[in-house]
Amino acid sequence: AKAANVQIVTGDTKVVKKGEVDKIYINTAGIGMIPDGIDIGPHRVKAGLDIILSGAIGDHSIAVMGQRFGLDLSDSLTTDCAPLNKMVQAVLDKVGTQVALLRDPTRGGLGTVLKEIADQSQVGIKVEETAIPIHEEVQSVCNILGYDPLYLANEGKVVLIVEPSVTDEVLKILHSFEEGSEAVLIGKTLDKNIGKVGLQTAIGGVRLIDLLGEDQVPRIC
């Protein structure tokens, strides 16, 4: 809360029978405000916009799974949990009117979020597989266990859909924060193939991305 400059304004406790709860359970509800002049949502997404991803995907799912199941993973592979409000605020302060949508690729991962955007906004989406950052350790685990990193949960990433005229500026802002140091342009919205997400693969083909059918790993968040 301190890192995100969030105030904890109230709390509550519950009394349960002895032995029913052996650890602390925490549940939170956040309340925020939408700044004046900011209009962000699926209704703003149209064809011809750029899609930016703030960093590498899959770290959180694989790190948590490794701890849960005792996998011997690299010490460098850790959850990506991080407060993003300061980074996002910096983008909105500078080019807020040119930002159409912000989404968090949490449960269901990047693939599910992109498909939801295509459906809700009635646009087509094309993304480049080679542009999507995936750390080597994550890709290795996915290769061994048969997971698709596009559908792994993330806890410290954001997808931004912006006007092409501000893409370079948005990337510069994101790169100035540790949480956005690996931010990249991954694709565009289209006026064709409405409701579909096409992944341009490394070998030159196109793979259609759909919603996550079922969790690849046990629920982690």
Annotate each language-model stretch with its function:
Residues A1-C221:
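Helix-biased detector of long, well-ordered alpha-helical tracts
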